[in-house]
Amino acid sequence: MFSIQQPLLVFSDLDGTLLDSHSYDWQPAAPWLSRLREANVPVILCSSKTSAEMLYLQKTLGLQGLPLIAENGAVIQLAEQWQDIDGFPRIISGISHGEISQVLNTLREKEHFKFTTFDDVDDATIAEWTGLSRSQAALTQLHEASVTLIWRDSDERMAQFTARLNELGLQFMQGARFWHVLDASAGKDQAANWIIATYQQLSGKRPTTLGLGDGPNDAPLLEVMDYAVIVKGLNREGVHLHDEDPARVWRTQREGPEGWREGLDHFFSAR
């Protein structure tokens, strides 16, 4: 097993995992965040959110300066002390937000798929959709390598849309509330593996990894973790992993930050 004293990295999704899906509250997780910070265990946020959103949340959570994974792995924000790494401060995978937007606009115009992207509306509308303040909602529009959208067509059309995106080298990914389009080469798992390898190179030892998530788009991340917490979520599909050995994977009874705390309690407090 593992302990909080050994080289360890914690990777965590945000909405529905570390943050409450509705209120964005994270206080139930605060004691564990403090304990991990005191033990110098990096908590690496991993989300579909933009890096601008996540840097704001990172500071709120007391995790500033650490690396993070934004836009479902298409963007890696490097740790403050990694300034000598090529690409600092951010590494972007695949094609840009602007290029993806052009593809989507073409598909919508020529093939009449029905969806609304965050680029189609203003920050006031996004604030209504999400419950965020307008200033925070504005940060959700600062995509660098993905597009977030609401699907407004049938399941059959979604299958056709997904196939067209795949033909064009893109992927269509479901998040907690919205859908995301990004380069097919990007992913939370690839981004996490890159960060793990970087820590290993800097320390000379591979860290043990623990990941926490609640939605289908967290599955690739949790697959590459040594240990995983599947936080009870709202998504009807849930999270399914290839290896669900109970010694490696814990499914929580609670949702959001309560479940996050439960997962940490399970893997650490009993050891």
Curated annotation (Swiss-Prot):
Keywords: Cytoplasm, Hydrolase, Magnesium, Metal-binding. It comes from the Bacteria. It is found in: Cytoplasm. Its cofactor is Mg(2+). One of its GO terms (biological process) is mannosylglycerate biosynthetic process. It is an enzyme of class 3 (hydrolase). Its EC number is 3.1.3.70. The keyword Heme does not apply. It catalyses: 2-O-(alpha-D-mannosyl)-3-phosphoglycerate + H2O = (2R)-2-O-(alpha-D-mannosyl)-glycerate + phosphate. GO terms for molecular function: magnesium ion binding; mannosyl-3-phosphoglycerate phosphatase activity. Pfam families: Hydrolase_3. NCBIfam families: HAD-SF-IIB, HAD-SF-IIB-MPGP, MPGP_rel, PRK03669.1. This is Mannosyl-3-phosphoglycerate phosphatase. It comes from Escherichia coli (strain SE11). The lineage of its organism: Bacteria, Pseudomonadati, Pseudomonadota, Gammaproteobacteria, Enterobacterales.
